[in-house]
Design a protein with these regions (language model features):
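Broad gene-expression machinery/nucleic-acid interaction feature
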Residues: 6-8, 44, 56-62
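Basic/polar N-terminal segments that are highly enriched at the extreme N-terminus
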Residues: 1-2, 71
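Short, well-ordered alpha-helical segments
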Residues: 4-38
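Short, conserved loop-to-beta-strand elements that form functional interface hotspots
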Residues: 40-49
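C-terminal structural segments of small proteins and small subunits
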Residues: 52-71
Length: 71
């Protein structure tokens, strides 16, 4: 078995409905440009507020993917 190296990037997803949808949006959007995603870790949840009401849920997600060298 060969050694593997993984890279981690942080993305923030948003949703007007829930934190779960916000996290899903973050992962699905990242998957459009990153290959071989492995693990998503929700590291922070917050909301945006306007006029005293929650308008969007936000999920900050660290996503790991397999690093491919240019060699």
């Amino acid at each position: 078995m060969s050694d593997s190296i993984y890279r981690v990037t942080e993305v923030i997803g948003t949703s007007p409905d829930s934190w779960e949808d916000a996290a899903r949006n973050a992962v699905e959007t990242a998957a459009r440009t990153l290959r071989d995603l492995r693990v998503g870790e929700v590291v922070k949840l917050d909301v945006t507020i306007e006029d005293g009401h929650v308008t969007h849920y936000r999920a900050r997600v660290n996503i790991s993917f397999k690093y491919e060298s240019g060699d």
